[in-house]
């Protein structure tokens, strides 16, 4: 972001907290479609001149201000859907460009909070991966006893999102334009605003930014109290959260003695907090009484500070040893790992049973088969079938599509402690690919496998399997058992549609 700061001309705008003029900048909308911010060629080949695009943007914004949002019929909602990705394209482009502009204050603060050392940058990049959470769970969860899976509530009114964002973006004009976007979308379906699977196709960049700012608002307070009350300070969260006007938002001043009492009341050095998608996990080594205190504290924080409604009865507290947690596409549970140690002292020998808890991560085979059945790779029982819609493609395209899906699933579930379910999913995809090719060539599966079986199956090998076969062509049982262990990758930043069963 630092290299684009001069290009954005942010010094003048940031000095007065005025971002609204950036809406009329041509390169903003080019960057909105270039999500990586890396390809400078796109900035030069936009396709239309600055004057025409500036007039279009001015007209659309004026039309938005002139609309009467109180009188909208059902027919108008179908014909003039504001955020439809196939209808009213220019309005969607404005909303995408607006999302890029609102992200600027967040990006500048995150860049300034990072240290200039290369190790810190690499560490922060690795923490973006979804798999970075699992080594943390492997390290911490065996020492904990209770876990609570919490569904993060969303605000009941759109103005709460605007007020939350007001502490980051102090530009009234931009906030007024944001209100127009939100109220226009609210007339169609407010529930789909927070549900990722429903609004992800409309404008995910804007609404994910709003949702993350809403969650970050209450987490900044929650983690502030957590750090103050713990003997083990969580310094790693400093680059992700900021305490935004914490004491200014409290209507009445709080006495220092009372604050210390509250912090002592929640003191627990073994409390851990993890957030993923729209849920969060609270895990502790202490008794269920302390977990209940944290549960009601969270509910009061949501209701009194963030003005969102949450029911304490929906937050369940479970024992890790008896409860399986569905977490980012894995079924995670604590499995006792028994080991027998024989020790001998002079003439006496002793046999001791040593039981250690270990995090067990399993592939959810039934939800995965349901997902494969929906996209016609298999039937409801998990038997592979041909993909009829791909039969008209070339052989290379058919194999390439199946191989990419198979490798993505293998890559994501490489951390599974038991590979049997993963092998079954790969078998379904391989046989579905063979049946699709056999259907295209009007042949049987057996005949097709006799001709191209060995070469075809080699395409489905992952990179790890190929390297292992080259290094250890005749690996022993011990080596095969070793390489069947869990592997976590730090280059996974999103969940595949087949993996996401939420």
UniProtKB/Swiss-Prot annotation:
The record describes the protein's role as:
Usually encoded in the trnK tRNA gene intron. Probably assists in splicing its own and other chloroplast group II introns.
Its name, as the record gives it, is: Maturase K
Its subcellular locations are: Plastid, Chloroplast
The record's family statement is: Belongs to the intron maturase 2 family. MatK subfamily.
SS bond partners: none
Q: Which GO terms describe its cellular component?
A: chloroplast
Instruction: Report if keyword Plastid is assigned.
Output: yes
Keyword Metal-binding among UniProt keywords:
no
Q: Which keywords label this protein? A: Chloroplast, mRNA processing, Plastid, RNA-binding, tRNA processing
Q: Give the Gene Ontology MF terms in alphabetical order.
A: RNA binding
For this entry, list what GO says about its biological process. Answer: mRNA processing; RNA splicing; tRNA processing
């Amino acid at each position: 972001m630092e290299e684009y700061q001069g290009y954005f001309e942010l010094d003048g705008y940031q000095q007065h907290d005025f971002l609204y003029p950036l809406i009329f900048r041509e390169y903003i909308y080019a960057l909105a479609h270039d999500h990586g911010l890396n390809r400078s060629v796109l900035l030069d080949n936009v396709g239309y001149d600055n004057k025409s695009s500036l007039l279009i943007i001015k007209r659309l914004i004026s039309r938005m201000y002139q609309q009467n949002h109180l009188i909208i019929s059902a027919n108008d909602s179908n014909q003039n859907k504001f955020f439809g990705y196939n209808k009213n394209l220019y309005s969607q482009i404005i909303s995408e460009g607006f999302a890029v502009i609102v992200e600027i204050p967040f990006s500048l603060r995150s860049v300034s909070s990072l240290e200039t050392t290369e190790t810190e940058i690499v560490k922060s990049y690795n923490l973006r991966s979804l798999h970075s959470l699992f080594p943390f769970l492997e390290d911490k969860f065996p020492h904990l006893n209770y876990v609570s899976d919490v569904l993060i509530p969303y605000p009941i009114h759109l103005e709460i999102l605007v007020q939350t964002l007001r502490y980051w973006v102090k530009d009234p004009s931009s906030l007024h334009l944001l209100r127009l976007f939100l109220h226009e979308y609210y007339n169609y379906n407010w529930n789909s605003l927070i549900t990722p699977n429903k609004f992800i196709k409309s404008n995910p960049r804007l609404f994910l930014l709003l949702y993350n700012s809403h969650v970050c608002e209450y987490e900044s307070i929650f983690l502030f109290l957590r750090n103050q009350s713990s003997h083990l300070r969580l310094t790693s969260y400093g680059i992700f959260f900021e305490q935004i006007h914490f004491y200014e938002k409290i209507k009445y001043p709080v006495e220092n003695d009372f604050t210390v009492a509250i912090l002592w009341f929640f003191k627990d050095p073994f409390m851990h907090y993890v957030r993923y998608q729209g849920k969060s996990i609270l895990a502790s080594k202490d008794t269920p009484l302390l977990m209940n205190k944290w549960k009601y504290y969270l509910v009061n924080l949501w209701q009194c500070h963030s003005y969102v409604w949450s029911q304490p009865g929906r937050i369940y507290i479970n024992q890790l040893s008896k409860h399986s947690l569905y977490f980012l596409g894995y079924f995670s549970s604590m499995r006792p790992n028994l080991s027998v140690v024989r020790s001998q002292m002079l003439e006496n020998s002793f046999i001791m049973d040593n039981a250690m808890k270990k995090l067990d991560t399993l592939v959810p085979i039934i939800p995965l088969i349901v997902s494969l059945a929906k996209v016609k790779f298999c039937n409801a029982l998990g038997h592979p079938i041909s993909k009829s819609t791909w039969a008209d493609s070339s052989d290379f395209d058919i194999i390439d599509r199946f191989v990419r899906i198979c490798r993505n699933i293998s890559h994501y579930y490489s951390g599974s402690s038991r590979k049997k379910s993963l092998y079954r999913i790969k078998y379904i995809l391989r046989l579905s690919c063979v049946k699709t090719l056999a259907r295209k060539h009007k042949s049987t599966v057996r005949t097709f496998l006799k001709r191209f079986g060995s070469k075809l199956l080699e395409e489905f090998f992952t990179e790890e399997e190929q390297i292992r076969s080259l290094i250890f062509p005749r690996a022993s049982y011990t080596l095969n058992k070793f390489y069947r262990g869990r592997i976590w990758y730090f280059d996974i930043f999103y969940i595949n549609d087949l993996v996401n069963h939420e």
